[in-house]
């Protein structure tokens, strides 16, 4: 079978290349990590060199967040005698393991709650395994304890002797086998030790359309007051990768919210927060499904679940 020929080129060992069922049936395979196209030169051409009527790859997508993996979509080309309606698609897809998430909060943690609820309902292919906070009695920490999620105090403070140092925090998150770090209203600057340990795996949500109204001092209601005072007609949440500075990492997703003529900061904040809850869950779903891809110019994109050639 042509599909078996393709898979055997990825998985030369018989244990990694199981028998594939009828091509009209969907199938899922575990592939070894593919770190670059150069590892598999035959992938550099869309036509894999099989004769007419064989399977030809039509899409290759490199996943660059945490563990590298590939998804391959194949279609059976028609011979000169084949009827068009006999064409069909075959999809060989990497099996994605369930991800482990660490969430950082400083307050009530409404975004944290939305993510946790999505995980419990099954719409999110990951679990919040640990909560990190700089305020041990904040609402987010209380919610975590009530739901059996371990709570870690960071950073270490004079009045909080149980707090961790940056290196201790990195070691602790590694013990929890954390895949992604999600900042959800966490007001402390993330230490460089953590950024280096979890490269391209730390995300933050900010209540404005970055790069506008971001940076040190722009948080909470201060952001919405500044947006209204500026006369801006639109605002909305931004989710971005975290670097060594406040709100300067690569933008991953945004959602536009109109600023109404007579808006108060509280009214605008409520509408933006509603969009935050939806957007963060959608982005974390994409992270857990390994649907983040990188453009050649370094811009991250979220791949559509339904169509790998479309981006959200």
Swiss-Prot record:
CDD domains: FMT_core_GART. It catalyses: N(1)-(5-phospho-beta-D-ribosyl)glycinamide + (6R)-10-formyltetrahydrofolate = N(2)-formyl-N(1)-(5-phospho-beta-D-ribosyl)glycinamide + (6S)-5,6,7,8-tetrahydrofolate + H(+). Pathway: Purine metabolism; IMP biosynthesis via de novo pathway; N(2)-formyl-N(1)-(5-phospho-D-ribosyl)glycinamide from N(1)-(5-phospho-D-ribosyl)glycinamide (10-formyl THF route): step 1/1. The active site is at residue 206. PROSITE patterns: GART (PS00373). It comes from the Eukaryota. It is found in: Plastid, Chloroplast. InterPro entries: Formyl_transf_N, Formyl_transf_N_sf, GART, GART_AS. One of its GO terms (biological process) is 'de novo' IMP biosynthetic process. Signal peptide: none annotated. (6R)-10-formyltetrahydrofolate binds at residues 162, 187-190, 204, 247. Its EC number is 2.1.2.2. Keywords: Chloroplast, Plastid, Purine biosynthesis, Transferase, Transit peptide. NCBIfam families: PurN (TIGR00639). This is Phosphoribosylglycinamide formyltransferase, chloroplastic. It comes from Vigna unguiculata. The gene is PUR3.
């Amino acid at each position: 079978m042509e599909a078996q020929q393709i898979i055997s080129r990825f998985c030369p060992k018989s244990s990694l290349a199981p028998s594939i069922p009828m091509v009209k049936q969907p199938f899922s395979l575990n592939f070894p990590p593919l770190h670059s196209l150069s590892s598999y030169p035959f992938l550099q051409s869309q036509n894999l060199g099989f004769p007419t009527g064989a399977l030809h790859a039509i899409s290759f997508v490199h996943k660059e967040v945490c563990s590298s993996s590939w998804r391959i979509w194949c279609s059976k080309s028609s011979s000169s005698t084949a009827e068009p309606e006999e064409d069909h698609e075959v999809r060989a897809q990497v099996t994605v393991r369930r991800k482990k998430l660490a969430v950082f909060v400083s307050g009530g943690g409404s975004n944290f709650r939305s993510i946790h609820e999505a995980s419990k309902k099954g719409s999110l292919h990951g679990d919040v395994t640990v909560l990190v906070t700089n305020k041990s009695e904040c609402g987010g920490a209380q919610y975590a304890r009530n739901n059996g999620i371990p709570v870690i105090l960071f950073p270490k403070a004079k009045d909080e002797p149980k707090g961790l140092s940056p290196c201790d925090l990195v070691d602790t998150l590694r013990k929890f086998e954390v895949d992604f770090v999600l900042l959800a209203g966490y007001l402390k600057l993330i230490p460089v030790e953590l950024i280096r340990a979890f490269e391209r795996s730390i995300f933050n949500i900010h209540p404005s359309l970055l790069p506008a109204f971001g940076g040190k001092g722009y948080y909470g209601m201060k952001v919405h007051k500044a947006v209204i005072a500026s006369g801006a007609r639109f605002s909305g949440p931004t989710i971005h990768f975290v670097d060594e500075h406040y709100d300067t990492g690569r933008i991953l997703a945004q959602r536009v919210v109109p600023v109404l003529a007579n808006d108060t900061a509280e009214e605008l904040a409520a509408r933006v927060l509603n969009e935050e809850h939806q957007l963060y869950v959608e982005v974390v779903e994409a992270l857990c499904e390994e649907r983040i891809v990188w453009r050649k110019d370094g811009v991250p994109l979220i791949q559509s679940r339904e169509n790998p050639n479309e981006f959200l």
